[in-house]
Protein backbone atom coordinates (compact mmCIF):
# COMPACT_ATOMS: atom_id res chain seq x y z
CA UNK A 1 0.00 0.00 0.00
CA UNK A 2 1.46 3.41 -0.99
CA UNK A 3 2.13 6.09 1.65
CA UNK A 4 -0.27 9.11 1.84
CA UNK A 5 0.51 12.32 -0.07
CA UNK A 6 1.89 15.22 1.97
CA UNK A 7 1.77 18.87 0.85
CA UNK A 8 5.16 20.41 0.02
CA UNK A 9 5.84 24.17 0.00
CA UNK A 10 7.88 24.62 -3.14
CA UNK A 11 7.34 28.44 -3.37
CA UNK A 12 7.77 29.40 0.31
CA UNK A 13 4.34 30.74 1.01
CA UNK A 14 4.09 29.08 4.39
CA UNK A 15 7.35 30.61 5.62
CA UNK A 16 6.26 34.08 4.50
CA UNK A 17 2.99 33.65 6.28
CA UNK A 18 4.69 32.42 9.44
CA UNK A 19 7.24 35.33 9.74
CA UNK A 20 5.62 38.78 10.19
CA UNK A 21 6.98 41.76 8.22
CA UNK A 22 9.14 44.40 9.98
CA UNK A 23 6.68 47.12 9.13
CA UNK A 24 3.82 45.26 10.67
CA UNK A 25 5.86 44.47 13.76
CA UNK A 26 6.95 48.09 14.11
CA UNK A 27 3.42 49.23 13.69
CA UNK A 28 2.17 46.76 16.24
CA UNK A 29 5.02 47.37 18.69
CA UNK A 30 4.48 51.16 18.86
CA UNK A 31 0.85 51.68 19.60
CA UNK A 32 -0.59 55.10 20.21
CA UNK A 33 -1.66 56.08 23.69
CA UNK A 34 -5.16 55.66 22.44
CA UNK A 35 -4.39 52.10 21.39
CA UNK A 36 -4.47 52.77 17.61
CA UNK A 37 -1.62 51.90 15.25
CA UNK A 38 0.36 54.86 13.69
CA UNK A 39 1.61 54.70 10.10
CA UNK A 40 5.04 55.79 8.79
CA UNK A 41 5.87 59.55 8.83
CA UNK A 42 5.64 61.16 5.40
CA UNK A 43 7.12 64.57 4.47
CA UNK A 44 6.47 66.69 1.37
CA UNK A 45 9.64 67.77 -0.48
CA UNK A 46 10.50 69.39 -3.79
CA UNK A 47 12.87 67.17 -5.72
CA UNK A 48 13.28 64.12 -7.86
CA UNK A 49 12.52 60.73 -6.38
CA UNK A 50 15.61 59.08 -4.92
CA UNK A 51 17.52 62.39 -4.62
CA UNK A 52 17.64 62.16 -0.85
CA UNK A 53 21.19 61.71 0.55
CA UNK A 54 22.27 60.83 4.10
CA UNK A 55 24.57 63.94 4.27
CA UNK A 56 21.69 66.36 3.80
CA UNK A 57 19.88 67.48 6.89
CA UNK A 58 16.17 66.92 6.90
CA UNK A 59 14.39 70.13 7.74
CA UNK A 60 10.95 69.63 9.14
CA UNK A 61 9.31 72.64 7.56
CA UNK A 62 6.23 73.18 5.51
CA UNK A 63 6.07 74.37 1.92
CA UNK A 64 6.63 78.15 1.96
CA UNK A 65 7.53 80.91 -0.51
CA UNK A 66 10.21 82.45 1.71
CA UNK A 67 14.02 82.17 1.39
CA UNK A 68 15.61 78.78 1.74
CA UNK A 69 17.17 77.89 5.10
CA UNK A 70 20.99 78.05 5.27
CA UNK A 71 22.73 74.86 4.24
CA UNK A 72 26.08 73.47 5.29
CA UNK A 73 26.93 71.54 2.17
CA UNK A 74 30.08 72.15 0.16
CA UNK A 75 28.11 73.22 -2.87
CA UNK A 76 26.48 76.04 -0.92
CA UNK A 77 29.79 77.18 0.52
CA UNK A 78 31.41 77.64 -2.88
CA UNK A 79 31.82 81.20 -4.18
CA UNK A 80 30.89 82.35 -7.61
CA UNK A 81 34.22 84.09 -8.20
CA UNK A 82 37.63 83.30 -6.73
CA UNK A 83 39.07 85.74 -4.22
CA UNK A 84 42.35 86.16 -5.99
CA UNK A 85 43.35 85.70 -9.58
CA UNK A 86 46.29 87.09 -11.59
CA UNK A 87 44.08 89.43 -13.61
CA UNK A 88 42.17 90.67 -10.57
CA UNK A 89 45.40 91.27 -8.68
CA UNK A 90 46.89 93.23 -11.55
CA UNK A 91 43.80 95.42 -11.93
CA UNK A 92 43.60 96.10 -8.19
CA UNK A 93 47.28 97.07 -8.17
CA UNK A 94 46.81 99.52 -11.06
CA UNK A 95 43.76 101.08 -9.39
CA UNK A 96 45.69 101.53 -6.16
CA UNK A 97 48.60 103.15 -8.03
CA UNK A 98 46.26 105.56 -9.83
CA UNK A 99 44.57 106.51 -6.56
CA UNK A 100 47.97 107.19 -4.97
CA UNK A 101 48.96 109.44 -7.90
CA UNK A 102 45.71 111.40 -7.58
CA UNK A 103 46.27 111.86 -3.85
CA UNK A 104 49.74 113.26 -4.54
CA UNK A 105 48.53 115.60 -7.30
CA UNK A 106 45.59 116.96 -5.30
CA UNK A 107 47.62 119.19 -2.89
CA UNK A 108 49.56 120.68 -5.83
CA UNK A 109 46.40 122.18 -7.39
CA UNK A 110 45.93 125.89 -6.70
CA UNK A 111 42.95 126.78 -4.47
CA UNK A 112 40.08 128.63 -6.20
CA UNK A 113 40.08 132.40 -6.01
CA UNK A 114 37.98 133.80 -3.20
CA UNK A 115 34.87 135.63 -4.37
CA UNK A 116 33.81 138.99 -3.06
CA UNK A 117 31.42 138.58 -0.15
CA UNK A 118 28.17 140.52 -0.36
CA UNK A 119 26.50 141.03 3.00
CA UNK A 120 22.99 142.36 3.47
CA UNK A 121 19.45 141.63 4.46
CA UNK A 122 17.35 140.23 2.89
CA UNK A 123 19.94 137.72 1.59
CA UNK A 124 21.43 138.56 -1.79
CA UNK A 125 20.86 135.95 -4.47
CA UNK A 126 23.63 134.37 -6.54
CA UNK A 127 22.87 136.20 -9.80
CA UNK A 128 22.87 139.51 -7.91
CA UNK A 129 26.27 138.68 -6.40
CA UNK A 130 27.64 137.87 -9.85
CA UNK A 131 26.25 141.11 -11.24
CA UNK A 132 27.85 143.18 -8.49
CA UNK A 133 31.19 141.42 -8.95
CA UNK A 134 31.09 141.95 -12.74
CA UNK A 135 30.18 145.64 -12.40
CA UNK A 136 33.00 146.18 -9.89
CA UNK A 137 35.58 144.58 -12.19
CA UNK A 138 34.24 146.58 -15.17
CA UNK A 139 34.47 149.84 -13.21
CA UNK A 140 38.08 149.10 -12.28
CA UNK A 141 38.91 148.42 -15.92
CA UNK A 142 37.33 151.69 -17.07
CA UNK A 143 39.13 153.69 -14.38
CA UNK A 144 42.42 152.10 -15.40
CA UNK A 145 41.82 152.88 -19.08
CA UNK A 146 40.89 156.48 -18.28
CA UNK A 147 43.97 156.96 -16.15
CA UNK A 148 46.24 155.58 -18.87
CA UNK A 149 45.07 157.76 -21.77
CA UNK A 150 41.51 159.04 -21.60
CA UNK A 151 38.30 157.35 -22.74
CA UNK A 152 38.37 155.15 -25.80
CA UNK A 153 35.33 156.73 -27.51
CA UNK A 154 34.08 160.32 -27.25
CA UNK A 155 30.50 161.45 -27.91
CA UNK A 156 29.97 164.11 -30.57
CA UNK A 157 26.83 166.26 -30.75
CA UNK A 158 25.77 169.12 -33.01
CA UNK A 159 23.23 171.90 -32.63
CA UNK A 160 20.23 170.97 -34.77
CA UNK A 161 21.24 167.33 -35.29
CA UNK A 162 18.79 164.78 -33.84
CA UNK A 163 21.45 162.13 -33.20
CA UNK A 164 24.85 161.70 -31.60
CA UNK A 165 28.00 160.08 -32.91
CA UNK A 166 31.06 158.54 -31.29
CA UNK A 167 34.64 158.88 -32.43
CA UNK A 168 37.93 157.38 -31.35
CA UNK A 169 40.42 160.19 -30.93
CA UNK A 170 43.32 157.74 -31.18
CA UNK A 171 42.47 157.18 -34.85
CA UNK A 172 43.35 160.77 -35.77
CA UNK A 173 46.74 162.39 -35.70
CA UNK A 174 45.83 166.10 -35.73
CA UNK A 175 43.01 168.61 -35.38
CA UNK A 176 42.70 168.83 -39.16
CA UNK A 177 41.97 165.11 -39.51
CA UNK A 178 39.35 165.31 -36.74
CA UNK A 179 37.69 168.35 -38.35
CA UNK A 180 37.43 166.66 -41.75
CA UNK A 181 35.95 163.50 -40.21
CA UNK A 182 33.30 165.49 -38.32
CA UNK A 183 32.36 167.43 -41.46
CA UNK A 184 31.67 164.14 -43.23
CA UNK A 185 29.59 162.84 -40.31
CA UNK A 186 27.35 165.94 -40.15
CA UNK A 187 27.60 167.08 -43.77
CA UNK A 188 23.82 167.08 -44.32
CA UNK A 189 23.33 169.64 -41.52
CA UNK A 190 26.36 171.77 -42.33
CA UNK A 191 25.83 172.10 -46.10
CA UNK A 192 22.15 172.92 -45.67
CA UNK A 193 23.02 176.02 -43.65
CA UNK A 194 25.66 177.78 -45.82
CA UNK A 195 28.37 175.36 -44.78
CA UNK A 196 31.53 176.05 -42.87
CA UNK A 197 33.85 178.95 -43.48
CA UNK A 198 37.04 177.43 -44.93
CA UNK A 199 40.06 179.64 -44.45
CA UNK A 200 43.32 179.41 -46.34
CA UNK A 201 45.14 177.90 -43.38
CA UNK A 202 42.62 174.99 -43.41
CA UNK A 203 41.59 175.40 -39.80
CA UNK A 204 38.02 174.32 -40.64
CA UNK A 205 36.07 173.78 -37.41
CA UNK A 206 39.05 174.69 -35.27
CA UNK A 207 39.16 178.28 -36.47
CA UNK A 208 37.99 179.78 -33.20
CA UNK A 209 41.17 180.79 -31.43
CA UNK A 210 39.92 184.35 -30.80
CA UNK A 211 36.64 185.20 -29.10
CA UNK A 212 35.89 188.19 -31.38
CA UNK A 213 36.04 185.98 -34.50
CA UNK A 214 33.31 183.61 -33.30
CA UNK A 215 30.50 185.84 -34.62
CA UNK A 216 31.81 185.33 -38.17
CA UNK A 217 31.84 181.54 -37.79
CA UNK A 218 28.74 179.51 -38.64
CA UNK A 219 29.86 176.55 -36.48
CA UNK A 220 32.75 176.04 -34.09
CA UNK A 221 33.99 172.89 -32.39
CA UNK A 222 34.10 172.82 -28.61
CA UNK A 223 35.01 170.14 -26.09
CA UNK A 224 34.43 169.30 -22.43
CA UNK A 225 37.54 168.61 -20.38
CA UNK A 226 37.96 166.40 -17.32
CA UNK A 227 36.89 169.32 -15.07
CA UNK A 228 33.51 169.58 -16.90
CA UNK A 229 34.50 172.94 -18.47
CA UNK A 230 33.66 173.71 -22.11
CA UNK A 231 36.56 175.01 -24.20
CA UNK A 232 37.29 175.78 -27.84
CA UNK A 233 39.19 173.13 -29.75
CA UNK A 234 42.69 173.98 -30.95
CA UNK A 235 44.37 175.63 -27.96
CA UNK A 236 46.28 172.59 -26.65
CA UNK A 237 48.73 170.15 -28.19
CA UNK A 238 47.00 167.21 -29.82
CA UNK A 239 48.42 164.56 -27.47
CA UNK A 240 47.28 166.50 -24.39
CA UNK A 241 43.88 167.15 -25.95
CA UNK A 242 43.20 163.42 -26.48
CA UNK A 243 43.84 162.70 -22.79
CA UNK A 244 41.56 165.37 -21.28
CA UNK A 245 38.72 165.49 -23.84
CA UNK A 246 35.47 163.90 -22.61
CA UNK A 247 32.84 165.25 -25.06
CA UNK A 248 32.76 167.13 -28.37
CA UNK A 249 30.07 169.54 -29.53
CA UNK A 250 29.63 171.49 -32.75
CA UNK A 251 28.05 174.75 -31.63
CA UNK A 252 26.81 177.78 -33.49
CA UNK A 253 29.22 180.68 -33.50
CA UNK A 254 26.73 182.99 -31.78
CA UNK A 255 26.22 180.48 -28.94
CA UNK A 256 29.94 179.97 -28.46
CA UNK A 257 30.72 183.68 -28.07
CA UNK A 258 31.09 183.28 -24.31
CA UNK A 259 33.49 180.36 -24.59
CA UNK A 260 37.14 181.32 -24.77
CA UNK A 261 40.09 179.11 -25.55
CA UNK A 262 42.15 177.84 -22.66
CA UNK A 263 45.14 179.86 -23.83
CA UNK A 264 43.16 183.13 -23.62
CA UNK A 265 41.89 182.23 -20.14
CA UNK A 266 45.39 181.44 -18.94
CA UNK A 267 46.74 184.70 -20.37
CA UNK A 268 43.91 186.65 -18.70
CA UNK A 269 44.61 185.02 -15.36
CA UNK A 270 48.32 185.80 -15.63
CA UNK A 271 47.56 189.48 -16.19
From Swiss-Prot:
Keywords: Auxin signaling pathway, Nucleus, Repressor, Transcription, Transcription regulation. This is Auxin-responsive protein IAA5. Residues 151-255 form the PB1 domain. Disulfide bonds: none annotated. The keyword Repressor applies. Homodimers and heterodimers. Its main location: nucleus. The gene is IAA5. The keyword Repressor applies. Aux/IAA proteins are short-lived transcriptional factors that function as repressors of early auxin response genes at low auxin concentrations.
